Amino acid sequence: NKDWAHMWIQEGIGTYAEALAHYELGGQAAYDRIISAHRRGIKYKKPMVGGEELSEDETYAMTDIYTKGSFFMHSLRFLLGDEIFFPTLKKLATDSAYTYDNFVTSKDVEQLFSKSANKDLKPFFDFYLRTTDVIDFTIKEVGYQQYQIRINNFFMPLPVEISTSKGKEKMIVGKEGIRIQSSFPPLVDPNGYYLKKVTLLP
């Protein structure tokens, strides 16, 4: 990576690789335990990318480059799907354009994944890397067994798993939100693919 400001690329992805190794050894449950531990370890004190020309000490004082860096890759994997995520991650790790002979920035990683996904991922990268925010979901009952789900601080269309009385389904939640039918309040992202808070409004 180019300088200390982008150390999450090395440290975060390396930490995520540990979760993948646990999956190979112990299956999905082992992977989930590691990812949950990484999520619990996030401090949310400073953005992972805090500016150019950071010192080594300043960078490594931000432990989120490990934990949040790993969870960011977990979220990105869900957002893109394995069929896009893993070939792109392999390219990042093996293509000479991104290896140690070159200076790689967060922007380079963003553009690589955006190209593979054929979509602009800048809002997603900015949210995870350059803020300490979590995705703010609200759920409001708007009629008999009718619920409105909105995202209040992130406006890129986002695939989200939602559990209702009919089962679990992946839906795209855009800036207008979505309305769903359920006999009980829906569960948003029950498997924890995103850093989030969920509020059930009165």
What do these predicted regions represent?
Residues 1-32:
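Zinc-dependent metallopeptidase catalytic helix centered on the HExxH motif
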Residues 5, 62-147:
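Amphipathic alpha-helical substructures
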Residues 32-42:
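Short, surface-exposed loop or secondary-structure junction motifs
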Residues 40-53:
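Active-site-adjacent bridging/hinge elements
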Residues 50-66:
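Catalytic-site signature segments of enzymes, centered on catalytic residues
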Residues 121-122, 135, 142-193:
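Beta-strand-rich binding/interaction modules
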Residues 194-202:
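Glycine/proline-rich low-complexity spacer/linker segments in large multi-domain proteins
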